[in-house]
Amino acid sequence: QKWTAEGELLMTLGTPGKPAEKMSGNPFNMPTDVSVATDGTLYISDGYGNARIHHYTATGELIKSWGEPGDGPGQFLIPHSLCLDKTGNVYVADRENSRIQVFTADGQFVREWKGEHRPAHIWQGPDGNMYVAELGFRQGLTLDSSLYPEQPSPHEVSHPSGVKILTPLGQWLGGWGMSTDTPGDIIAGHAMAMDSKGDLYVGETLDGARVQKYARVG
């Protein structure tokens, strides 16, 4: 839904209470994120009940959709977040495939970054770098059997959550977070936002249940 800053409803996409059939590819079944391009068009990750990215005009007309369940290029297992860079490329946090996929504005696959720990949110900062919040894995975690028919052993899923900073090409620049409740560490990073000063706000789910602010230095 689109609202004014005063809370007036301007536009609704989809029909509230009537989701599309699960994994049908049709909008929407539990969408996860939306990003607005410089031309006003909308990109929506339709992630929890679909494996799809939808591109809409500023007035709500569907332009194109792409994606299907799987782990190949252009396939997704919970596309949980997306953002656009300054050239219009679309970065998708493909959470349960533990990777970031990059597409052109019209949905053509460009590249992928592997090795993320269940990336839940991606954001481009004013410095041009990409910030990725990782939900992470932990010992004893049971994964969705519909996505992982063969459950990994606990030692295979004991990767901490945190925030990574990468270039737009996926080169690692830094990061932090050790899955503890110590202030500054991150438990299950789930969403992020950045203010005009470049300060970063990270929302944590599961045992975290808090929002932490990180001030930009330099």
Q: What residue ranges belong to the model's regions?
A:
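Eukaryotic scaffold repeat domains enriched in small/polar residues
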Residues: Q1-G218
